[in-house]
Design a protein with these regions (language model features):
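Cleavable N-terminal export/targeting peptides
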Residues: 1-49, 365-384
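Short loop/turn motifs that connect adjacent beta-strands in outer-membrane beta-barrel proteins
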Residues: 40-43, 56-65, 77-79, 115, ...
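Surface-exposed strand-loop-strand hairpins of Gram-negative outer-membrane beta-barrel proteins
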Residues: 42-43, 74-103, 198-201
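Residues on the lipid-exposed face of transmembrane beta-strands in outer-membrane beta-barrel proteins
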Residues: 56-59, 70-72, 106-110, 120, ...
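Residues that define the transmembrane beta-barrel architecture of outer-membrane proteins
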Residues: 64, 100-104, 139-146, 163, ...
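Transmembrane beta-strands of outer-membrane beta-barrel pores
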Residues: 72-78, 122-128, 154, 171-177, ...
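Outer membrane beta-barrel transmembrane domains
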Residues: 81-92, 235-384
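Outer-membrane pore/translocation modules
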Residues: 126-254
Length: 384
């Protein structure tokens, strides 16, 4: 039950021109599973991302500058789907699975030069899983899979203040546990069992995240398009139960790729300095097959995706940026996994109706910034 997991490592970052649309999914995404939190509930894709380009007061980061941030993502998934068809009978009979996920991301970016930067991200997950007609509640908490990414602007920010594209490549490190166990009591019998993979803090494998961020200023608006895809270098993770599962294709959890795409427009409110409204579509999910040929795409996974509309606001002041968005799902699809296809089945997954996202960043400027970089930072903060 349940869809993807939740990406925790992915942050879509773009700093430039006039507006910094810094919010996003957290990313973990971008969709996004701490290894699996992106999508919705059980699917596992976790992300707190950023949207847009640089803000009107900070502009591009100057060489030697630091930016620190905290991202937050909350979702409550309980709406079951098989394919794109909602399974209404689950809530009517009270058999729905309810996943509650709270994901925080702590990250820091260091600007190496005018074009290049590095970012380190550490996620923290707190989650619970409960079948409505059962008294047993499964829980997990801990550090998720951390990441380190290098990012670079295609064009020199000192020359391109009205639009640019940033590309990033990094490593997702298996710092989160993928075998969290709970001790439960059922029918007078006490046992210790692994929790469902949708609330495991880690995936148990090394990943290669790559991302892009693009923005273009037009009049007083900024249009943005951000995305992230994480390729996993491992096929199978932890065993799903303490005993051998007779269904050999799914006795282990799959270590899944995950992705996030989002775009939209940011419009400043002229009467309130530093306030910007955001709106655009968002898509995040987990594919049925991984990109890298490291296995047979077996193991247990809940592939699928969710498409949402995401309105939000952002407030910028003195290099501090606070963003809040709410993603409302308008289309959800639990696609078939490779074991589903081989056995003729089609599993279900629980999705969220709403995903709540918040992000706060602040900057620490390098005191010994050169005259050239000072001019660069000042120019980037001006409207075109």
């Amino acid at each position: 039950m349940g869809f993807f997991r939740v990406f925790s490592h992915t942050r879509t970052v773009a700093r430039s021109g006039r507006l910094l649309v810094a919010l996003g999914a957290i990313s973990l995404s971008l969709l996004v599973c701490v290894p699996h939190a992106f999508g919705q509930g059980c699917i596992v894709a976790r992300s707190n991302g950023e949207q847009g380009g640089p803000d009107s007061e900070g502009g591009y980061l100057a060489s030697g500058d630091w930016e620190f941030g905290i991202g937050y993502r909350h979702q409550f998934s309980y709406i079951h789907f098989v394919g794109a068809t909602e399974q209404n009978y689950r809530t009517q009979l009270g058999t729905q699975v309810e996943n509650k996920i709270n994901l925080e991301n702590f990250y820091a970016t260091y600007q190496i030069s005018a074009r290049f930067s590095v970012t380190a991200d550490i996620p923290l997950l707190t989650a619970s899983r409960h079948t409505n007609n059962s008294s047993i509640i499964y829980t997990s908490a801990g550090i998720g899979d951390s990441s380190v990414l290098a990012q670079g602007w295609i064009w020199d920010p000192r020359e391109k203040t009205s639009g640019n594209i940033q590309l990033g490549l990094g490593l997702l490190l298996p710092t989160g546990k993928d075998n969290v166990m709970n001790t439960i009591s059922s029918n007078g019998v006490t046992s210790t069992v692994p929790v469902d993979y949708s609330i495991q803090p880690g995936q148990g494998g090394l990943g290669i995240p790559w991302q892009w961020s693009a923005f273009k200023n037009w009049r007083t608006n900024q249009f943005y398009f951000n995305g992230s895809y994480t390729m996993m270098t491992k096929d199978l993770g932890a065993r799903r139960s303490n005993t051998n599962n007779p269904i050999t294709l799914t006795q282990f959890n799959a270590v899944t790729d995950q992705y996030l795409m989002e775009g939209g427009v940011a419009h400043p409110i002229s009467r309130i300095r530093g306030l910007t409204v955001l709106f655009g579509p968002r898509m995040e999910g987990v594919p049925a097959r991984n990109l890298l040929p490291v296995g047979d795409n077996l193991g247990f996974r809940r592939p699928g995706f969710a498409v949402s509309v995401e309105p939000g606001i952002q407030y910028t002041r003195n290099g501090n940026v606070l963003s809040i968005t709410i993603a409302r799902a308008i289309y959800r699809d639990r696609t078939r996994s490779v074991p589903d296809v081989l056995t003729g089945g089609h599993g279900d997954a629980a999705f969220a109706n709403w995903v709540w996202l918040a992000n706060y960043t602040f900057r620490v400027h390098h005191l010994d910034t050169s005259h050239a970089d000072q001019g660069h930072a000042a120019a980037a903060g001006k409207a075109d």
